[in-house]
């Protein structure tokens, strides 16, 4: 396959996986009132992109997903904050970076012998980093809705942890399952 064909294939697969991630992101058994939800494996396609094509590619694909998520359903959150700094923190912490870090899921590929463990661990760490992004957003721009800084820390920890802990578990289980589906992994690695 030529270099241009390989790039075209990578772009098409990435676009399809981002689209699948967006659709899965809308399947929300639990949706929180000020953003955030427990989804049905929506982070797995992003994690697969980071695993298959590398961290840099995965970071970009995750940031694209974050941008689309913001445009599709996250614009309502802007009504709750005011000021340019708050908008910038919201855009980066809750969308670009939070979803971008899912591309780090491939960080242990070929570094840990058991690839199921490597992918699951990478996806788990990526989800923890995503939680940290949302936590930072919570203690900075959402602090006005709590009683002081201690209240903001506890609020952000419980609110964001309330959906990110289940999301972490679902993502790790999904990644550990999908890496063992040989036809999918073989098709991606062609």
Each predicted region: which residue ranges?
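Hydrophobic transmembrane alpha-helices
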Residues: 1-60
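Internal alpha-helical transmembrane segments of multi-pass membrane proteins
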Residues: 110-131, 190
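Interfacial aromatic-anchored transmembrane helix boundaries in multi-pass membrane proteins
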Residues: 25-38, 64-106, 143
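Juxtamembrane/transmembrane-helix interface segments of polytopic membrane transporters
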Residues: 21, 25, 69, 73, ...
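Hydrophobic alpha-helical transmembrane segments
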Residues: 11-16, 44, 55-63, 88-92, ...
